[in-house]
């Protein structure tokens, strides 16, 4: 319960009983006194009471004395009646009728109402007066105020306790995170697990509020946890299975012919020992006897193949070319640079 809500409730509780008491003490125009015009009534009241024309207002617990004074030589017998129509006898106690006096001892809230005095001789006359009692004992406003104060006290204690618990938890969590950043090695992983136990899972509004407070350090801690998870070694069985699958894919991998040329262009320069060359298909077939055996394959559609060759020095290349010309009567190539194997060609098979 918020403070301004509690104050508003206290204000309402204070004003409602005041309005009820004003309703009780308001004069009623409907209660008109009826009396004989030949008699002038008068009432004598005790201290602490208030007298109006036909309404008497007294506080609860006070004593009141009503006297009916008539301008006649002799009084006849006076009878008093309450608002319920019951005649009040002069037997003492709370209601005391003495001559023309009505004494009420310790007025209660239930005594409010219309009181009538009647005189039967020498002439019949009557007079009515309304008695109003101000309610002072057992006030409901006090009850509501006590209930409101108790509820406010309980709410305040719960809020203060919750704030203290959250503050303590935040201080401990921040201290653990700072220690985590200062540790290194295997101890850091142990600190990480300790912090993970302290950080709650966001499942309600309270834990969401806690997460907002520690959002920055929690995210920073999560990044460290990810790095540590990458450094944790996998089980040997998983590692062997992964290596086996990688070797299997390497064995059955088939290169796409359309992407072969692009990959060769992007490949870095070959070292001086070996390389892969693509032979140009526009270049004519050799005049070797082995080549004459499959002349019909010239009309077939060309395909690209990867040929792995070894690169020799220039002197070795010239000697090899001379020996091959003497033995096989090969025609020398038009481009001398092709003998060194420094360019790429395509061949049709």
Curated annotation (Swiss-Prot):
Question: Which residues lie within the region annotated Disordered?
Answer: 280-349
Q: How does it sit in the membrane?
A: Single-pass type I membrane protein
Q: List the disulfide bonds.
A: 68-117
Q: Taking every annotated instance into account, which residue ranges of this chain make up the domain Ig-like C2-type?
A: 41-130
One Gene Ontology cellular component annotation? Answer: plasma membrane
Q: Where does it primarily localize? A: membrane
Q: What is this protein called?
A: Microfibril-associated glycoprotein 3
Q: Which PROSITE patterns match?
A: IG_LIKE (PS50835)
Q: Which residues cross the membrane?
A: 140-160
Q: How is it modified after translation?
A: Glycosylated.
Where along the chain is composition biased (Polar residues)? 311-331
> Which residues does the record list as glycosylated?
31, 36, 63, 103
Q: Cross-referenced InterPro entries, in alphabetical order?
A: Ig-like_dom, Ig-like_dom_sf, Ig-like_fold, Ig_sub, Ig_sub2
Q: Which residues lie on this side of the membrane: Cytoplasmic?
A: 161-349
Give a Pfam family name: Ig_3
List the Extracellular topological domains.
22-139
Q: Where in the cell is it found?
A: Cell membrane
What does the function comment of this entry state?
Answer: Component of the elastin-associated microfibrils.
Alphabetized UniProt keyword annotations: Cell membrane, Disulfide bond, Glycoprotein, Immunoglobulin domain, Membrane, Signal, Transmembrane, Transmembrane helix
Q: Give the organism, scientific name.
A: Mus musculus (Mouse)
**Residues of the signal sequence?**
1-21
């Amino acid at each position: 319960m918020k403070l301004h809500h509690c104050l508003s409730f206290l204000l309402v509780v204070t004003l409602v009983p005041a309005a009820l008491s004003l309703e009780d003490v308001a004069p009623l125009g409907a209660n008109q006194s009826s009396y004989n015009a030949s008699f002038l009534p008068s009432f004598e009241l005790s201290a602490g009471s208030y007298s109006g024309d036909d309404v008497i207002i007294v506080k609860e617990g006070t004593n009141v004395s009503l006297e009916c004074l008539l301008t006649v030589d002799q009084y006849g017998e006076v009878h008093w009646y309450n608002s319920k129509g019951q005649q009040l006898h002069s037997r003492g106690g709370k209601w005391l009728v003495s001559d023309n006096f009505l004494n009420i001892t310790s007025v209660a809230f239930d005594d409010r109402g219309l009181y009538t005095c009647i005189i039967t001789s020498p002439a019949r006359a009557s007079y009515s007066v309304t008695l109003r009692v101000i309610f002072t004992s057992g006030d409901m406003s006090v009850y509501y105020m006590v209930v409101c104060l108790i509820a406010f006290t309980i709410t305040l204690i719960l809020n203060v306790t919750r704030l203290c618990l959250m503050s303590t938890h935040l201080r401990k969590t921040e201290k653990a995170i700072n220690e985590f950043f200062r540790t290194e090695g295997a101890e850091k992983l142990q600190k990480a697990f300790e912090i993970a136990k302290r950080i709650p899972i966001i499942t309600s509004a309270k834990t969401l509020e806690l997460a907002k407070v520690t959002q920055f350090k929690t995210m920073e801690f999560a990044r460290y946890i990810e790095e540590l998870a990458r450094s944790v070694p996998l089980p040997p069985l998983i590692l062997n299975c992964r290596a086996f699958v990688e070797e299997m894919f390497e064995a059955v991998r088939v290169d796409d012919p359309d992407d072969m040329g692009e990959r060769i262009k992007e490949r870095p320069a070959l070292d001086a020992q070996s390389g892969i060359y693509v032979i140009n298909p526009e270049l004519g077939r050799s005049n070797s006897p082995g080549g004459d055996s499959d002349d019909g394959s010239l009309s077939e559609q060309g395909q690209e193949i990867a040929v792995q060759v070894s690169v020799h020095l220039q002197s070795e290349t010239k000697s090899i070319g001379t020996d091959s010309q003497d033995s096989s009567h090969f025609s020398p190539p038009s481009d001398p640079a092709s003998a060194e194997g420094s360019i790429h060609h395509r061949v049709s098979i």
